[in-house]
Swiss-Prot record:
Xref: InterPro entries: RuBisCO, RuBisCo_large_chain_AS, RuBisCO_lsu_C, RuBisCO_lsu_C_sf, RuBisCO_lsu_fd_N, RuBisCO_lsu_N_sf
Gene source species: Onychium japonicum (Japanese claw fern)
Keywords carried by this UniProt record: Calvin cycle, Carbon dioxide fixation, Chloroplast, Disulfide bond, Lyase, Magnesium, Metal-binding, Monooxygenase, Oxidoreductase, Photorespiration, Photosynthesis, Plastid
EC number, UniProt record: 4.1.1.39
Chloroplast keyword on record: yes
Binding residue positions for Mg(2+): K179, D181, E182
UniProt remark on cofactor binding: Binds 1 Mg(2+) ion per subunit.
Stated name of the protein: Ribulose bisphosphate carboxylase large chain
Organism classification: Eukaryota, Viridiplantae, Streptophyta, Embryophyta, Tracheophyta
């Protein structure tokens, strides 16, 4: 009863595209029905309480199955979920339902969630990015070019004072942002409060000398939500413009709580995707990053790391640009060549700035400005701090290269 090819999807349905590999001997229709059942109202047997509700109203429906070209025994199963199955404004509940139990199902050898269509009726119940791209540009007074960042290295082991010195040199050299590495929380060699204080001093000194607004992504991620909020509050009291969160290791509930605080208190929110490859790297099993990106846009974040296409971390060009559009744009058409299975309408939800980071350096600048355009953050860690003349010259090199590439694009020279 969960495989219903005659079903006409509604504008209010959440639609999911699963790449499924059934066990040998299990028909695709049976596997698709099992996915729809286990991720909605079904269980392993008929229960007498089924008669106390309207399963027809609440069940997920597998409404289409198509074989994957070039793959043996692999199918895309399309499942529609009625909106009443989900709590409003909760990414946690949405993912618990759709990907909670079904991935361990015996009838399947592998299962991957490739895409979700979030209807406006549901997306409008979420906070979304605390500020969004345009508000961030207005806050920073920076327009017409990608923003430049740098992750402070070595990621672990620096004292707070030396860390602050590196921040100052990079910002003084021309970068817009510096960043805590995702590993940096509050360790014995550098407690969070000391780091925040030295970084704030570096920020204000660099701002005074350059006349530009500067930021450092102060990582508020912590072992408890209460401690995370305490760090965000201290960052705001210091006058820092932006904080950071590891949204997958920290969790969506914590992330949305922090996003609400950031919106109410004028803080930008930078999101790191540490742990994403555990979930999204296998081609046949897990969750594609485009789904994690959509979930983040709803949960709340102004920046998120989105791969580079050209650096040390994996990322296919067309697929990467597909989820970059899903992060930034209001309306994204279905385009299977870019891995986009459904047309997505975000209506008025603000966009998220994609961050290119990981093994990139100044020689990648022409490709990065062409691929990501103006509305992006290009982040060079080793590509700044690895400059043979030091941190500040590394920052100068990146700023000069960025402005040269933007000028070339504007003048039609490329």
């Amino acid at each position: 009863t969960y495989y219903t090819p005659e079903y006409q999807t509604k504008d209010t349905d959440i639609l999911a595209a699963f790449r499924m590999t059934p066990q040998p001997g299990v028909p695709a229709e049976e596997a698709g029905a099992a996915v729809a059942a286990e991720s909605s109202t079904g269980t392993w047997t008929t229960v007498w309480t089924d008669g106390l509700t309207s399963l027809d109203r609440y069940k997920g429906r597998c409404y289409d199955i198509e074989p994957v070209a070039g793959e043996e025994n692999q199918y895309i199963a399309y499942v529609a979920y009625p909106l009443d199955l989900f709590e409003e404004g909760s990414v946690t509940n949405m993912l618990t339902s759709i990907v909670g139990n079904v991935f361990g199902f015996k009838a399947l050898r592998a299962l991957r969630l490739e895409d979700l269509r979030i209807p406006p009726a549901y997306s409008k119940t979420f906070i979304g990015p605390p500020h969004g791209i345009q508000v961030e540009r207005d806050k920073l007074n920076k327009y017409g070019r990608p923003l430049l960042g740098c992750t402070i290295k070595p990621k672990l082991g620096l004292s707070a004072k030396n860390y602050g010195r590196a921040v100052y040199e990079c910002l003084r050299g021309g970068l817009d942002f510096t960043k805590d590495d995702e590993n940096v929380n509050s360790q014995p060699f550098m407690r969070w409060r000391d780091r925040f204080l030295f970084v704030a001093e570096a920020l204000f000194k660099a701002q005074a000398e350059t006349g530009e607004i500067k930021g450092h992504y102060l990582n508020a991620t912590a072992g408890t939500c209460e401690e995370m909020m305490k760090r965000a509050v201290f960052a705001r009291e210091l006058g820092a413009p932006i904080v950071m969160h590891d949204y997958l290791t920290g969790g969506f509930t914590a992330n949305t709580s922090l996003a609400y605080y950031c919106r109410d208190n004028g803080l930008l929110l930078h999101i790191h995707r540490a742990m994403h490859a555990v979930i999204d790297r296998q081609r046949n099993h897990g969750i594609h990053f485009r789904v994690l990106a959509k979930a983040l846009r709803m949960s709340g974040g102004d920046h998120i790391h989105a791969g580079t296409v050209v650096g040390k971390l994996e990322g296919e060009r067309e697929v990467t640009l597909g989820f970059v559009d899903l992060l930034r744009d209001d309306y994204i058409e279905k385009d299977r060549s870019r891995g986009i299975y459904f047309t997505q309408d975000w209506v008025s939800m603000p966009g998220v700035l994609p961050v290119a980071s990981g093994g990139i350096h100044v020689w990648h600048m022409p490709a990065l400005t062409e691929i990501f355009g103006d509305d992006s953050v290009l982040q060079f860690g080793g590509g700044t701090l690895g400059h043979p003349w030091g941190n500040a010259p590394g920052a100068v090199a990146n700023r000069v290269a960025s402005e040269a590439c933007v000028q070339a694009l504007n003048e039609g020279l490329r």
